[in-house]
Amino acid sequence: MLNLLLLALPVLASRAYAAPAPGQALQRVGIVGGQEAPRSKWPWQVSLRVRDRYWMHFCGGSLIHPQWVLTAAHCVGPDVKDLAALRVQLREQHLYYQDQLLPVSRIIVHPQFYTAQIGADIALLELEEPVNVSSHVHTVTLPPASETFPPGMPCWVTGWGDVDNDERLPPPFPLKQVKVPIMENHICDAKYHLGAYTGDDVRIVRDDMLCAGNTRRDSCQGDSGGPLVCKVNGTWLQAGVVSWGEGCAQPNRPGIYTRVTYYLDWIHHYVPKKP
């Protein structure tokens, strides 16, 4: 089944910058059809940086506890990256302009992760020190296990990724936001089978995944690992983690996210429920 799925999805792409490892061609990178985020919004958004000629943004993430960041496994695994070459930047309006990079003490990749398309595309980063929570920087709320995020619910995805297929976010690199509707998994799966070489009995969109977006609005390369959030009864809940898709805002190819409720037990094995 694994080989069948990998062979059947040759053009899907995960949404992270930098050369992907074998089988990781599907990661996501940017916001298509969105606009610059207001400075007062999305205080849990973080940027993951890797040391190159400078500390380069390569993925997003979310602050779920003063000392823990939630991101996509394909950003930091399956082989754990060198901690010395990894940093976290908390919420900033423009990349690189007021960096205060934080070191990471531990990377935990879900043990079942192999590629984003197979699932379990989720990872945790433990910061060396807890951050000071403020109105500008604070945690996002994880959903209760019972939350389903029904089809059509308007949600938001944020990041500093590409603004279109193969079109990088230009300076001054503002944080972007876009509203996307939730889509039922079985409808999303049917859409991904259109024009694909997979049989209808092969599940492309799995139970631990969540679909959102349309042909005008989507996440894209560079947004990988970032949060998909939905407002439920006045509280922003993180429904998903940007994972993969085919192109960005393409017909019949919604964005695919790791479903956070599916992994709550795993998350709370490491992350305290209360700071």
UniProtKB/Swiss-Prot annotation:
Glycoprotein recorded as keyword: yes
GO MF annotations in UniProt: serine-type endopeptidase activity; serine-type peptidase activity
Catalytic activity, EC: 3.4.21.59
The protein's enzyme class: hydrolase
Signal peptide: 1-18
PROSITE patterns attached to this UniProt entry: TRYPSIN_DOM, TRYPSIN_HIS, TRYPSIN_SER
Glycosylation sites: 233
A Pfam family: Trypsin
Matching SUPFAM superfamilies: Trypsin-like serine proteases
Subunit composition and interactions: Homotetramer. The active tetramer is converted to inactive monomers at neutral and acidic pH in the absence of heparin. Low concentrations of inactive monomers become active monomers at pH 6.0 in the presence of heparin. When the concentration of active monomers is higher, they convert to active monomers and then to active tetramers. These monomers are active and functionally distinct from the tetrameric enzyme. In contrast to the hidden active sites in the tetrameric form, the active site of the monomeric form is accessible for macromolecular proteins and inhibitors, e.g.
Family according to the record: Belongs to the peptidase S1 family. Tryptase subfamily.
Protein name: Tryptase beta-2
